[in-house]
From Swiss-Prot:
Highest taxon listed in the record's lineage: Eukaryota
Residue span(s) of the pro-peptide: 21-114
GO molecular function, one term: serine-type endopeptidase activity
Record-given protein name: Subtilisin-like protease 3
Residues with glycosylation annotation: N133, N243, N251, N286, N307, N340, N366
Native organism: Pseudogymnoascus destructans (strain ATCC MYA-4855 / 20631-21) (Bat white-nose syndrome fungus)
Entry annotated with the keyword Secreted: yes
Domain (Peptidase S8) ranges: 123-404
Any Pfam family: Inhibitor_I9
Function recorded in the entry: Secreted subtilisin-like serine endopeptidase. Mediates the degradation of collagen, the major structural protein in the mammalian host. Degrades the nonhelical regions of collagen that function in the cross-linking of the helical components. May function as virulence factor involved in epidermal wing necrosis observed in white nose syndrome (WNS) in bats.
Length: 404
């Protein structure tokens, strides 16, 4: 009897796959910077049992249809976001998408780190975010509460982190690696630089926060959206297992063409109680066209220079919540335990604000922090009306509320 019920369920599931396929439920059809023949199938808000049945049936169908099928890729299972990555041809994905449980399909967008030019400079950014009225020339003075993000964790979803760097004082660990065949370290430098800005001993905003590296980009700073989503889920699950959700921040100094799957996954993580901070992007374009920057409840960060002018490369628009220093930023680098480098990008602005988020969470005495409260705090205390040429963006410049 149990076998009969299973058989009926299996046949019912495959009806949409057997009939003529109708229009593919593809949301980001215009995206061009994508991984070939790779898709993310996103389901409606179904229960875990139904989702597991869907994956089993799709796997069975594809195994019979294609002898070279190697199985489904990353699986994503979070509240209000369930799906998986699949490598297959458009016709096959079209048929799979006809299941009544499938909400939509996204092309697997390519993701890149947001760094730019290299130049000798100094960590003036810390000085700026702790002073209302500009930097202190020659002083590089950072005024902050000595709690400095203690008791919080910042997940750096990036190229990895060189955790042995002296800037991290043993506070950095390597959490997970989603680049097959790569070592558990940073081969590019971008992730280490970002981590240094967020929580380095000398370069960092929250210098007592823990750092956990989640590698989703390769040695060139590139990767696939499906790997980034897997890294995001790992970070959310890790924070949950440690009962540290309310004390965790995810930094995403990376981006891709707009992807609804990307944004929905980001919203799902925020709904779990984790602050997500995203770089606006470096195309001098509307940030509403990139992900995860366009996610409504993420804290999206644009870049400014020493003169409080929006950086020429920084994306802009209503998706931005706040600006932060992002030009000529000095931080940790790879190649030696005390290596450093000065680079620019919204990738550098983003960890200033991720560090601020951890800093403000650390100041909470009763542990009632939420992503909404932290976002409101960051936008509320930001220095207003000082950013030059914000270009239809909120004129907020990040501030730690402890300087003068």
């Amino acid at each position: 009897m149990l076998f009969s019920k299973s058989l009926v369920a299996l046949v019912a599931c495959f009806l949409p796959l057997i009939v003529s396929a109708t229009e593919l439920k593809l949301r980001n059809a215009a995206a061009t910077n994508v991984a070939a023949d790779s898709y993310i199938v996103v389901y409606k808000d179904i229960d875990d049992s139904t989702f597991e049945s869907e994956m089993f049936n799709v796997h069975s169908f594809l195994s019979k249809r294609d002898s070279t099928f190697r199985g489904l890729g990353h699986k994503y299972k979070m509240p209000k976001f369930k799906g998986y990555q699949i490598e297959s041809d458009m016709d096959t994905v079209n048929r799979i998408s006809q299941s009544p449980h499938v909400a939509y399909v996204d092309k697997d967008v390519k993701v890149s780190a947001y760094d730019l030019s290299v130049r000798i400079g100094a960590p003036w950014g810390l000085d700026r975010i702790s002073h209302r009225n500009g930097t202190s020339p020659g002083l590089e003075e950072y005024t902050y509460d000595s709690s400095a993000g203690g008791g919080t964790t910042i997940y750096i979803i990036d190229t990895g982190v060189y955790i042995e760097h002296v800037e991290f004082e043993g506070r950095a660990t390597f959490g997970a690696n989603f680049i097959p065949g790569s070592p558990d370290t940073d081969e590019d430098g971008h992730g280490t630089h970002v981590a240094g800005i967020a929580a380095g001993a000398n370069f960092g905003v929250a210098s007592k926060a823990k750092i956990i590296a989640v590698r989703v980009l390769d040695a060139n700073g590139d990767g696939k959206g499906s790997n980034v989503l897997a890294g995001m889920q790992w970070a959310a699950d890790d924070a949950g297992k440690k009962n540290q959700t309310a004390k965790s921040v995810i930094n995403m100094s990376l981006g891709a063409d707009y992807s609804e799957a990307f944004n929905k996954a980001t919203e799902a993580i925020i709904a779990k109680g984790i602050v997500v901070v995203a770089a606006a992007g470096n195309e001098d374009a509307n940030a509403s066209g990139v992900s995860p920057a366009s996610t409504v409840d993420a804290i999206t960060v644009g870049a400014t220079d020493r003169n409080d002018s929006r950086a020429a490369f920084s994306n802009w628009g209503v998706a931005l919540d706040v600006f932060a220093p992002g030009v000529d930023i000095l931080s940790a680098w790879i190649g030696g335990k005390d290596a450093n480098k000065t680079i620019s990008g919204t990738s550098m602005a983003c960890p200033h604000v991720a560090g601020l988020a951890a800093y403000f969470i650390g100041l909470e005495k009763n542990g009632t922090s939420t992503p909404s409260k932290i976002a409101t705090k960051i936008k509320g205390v930001a220095t207003k009306n000082v950013v030059l040429h914000p270009k239809n963006s909120r004129d907020n410049l990040a501030y730690n509320d402890d300087g003068y």
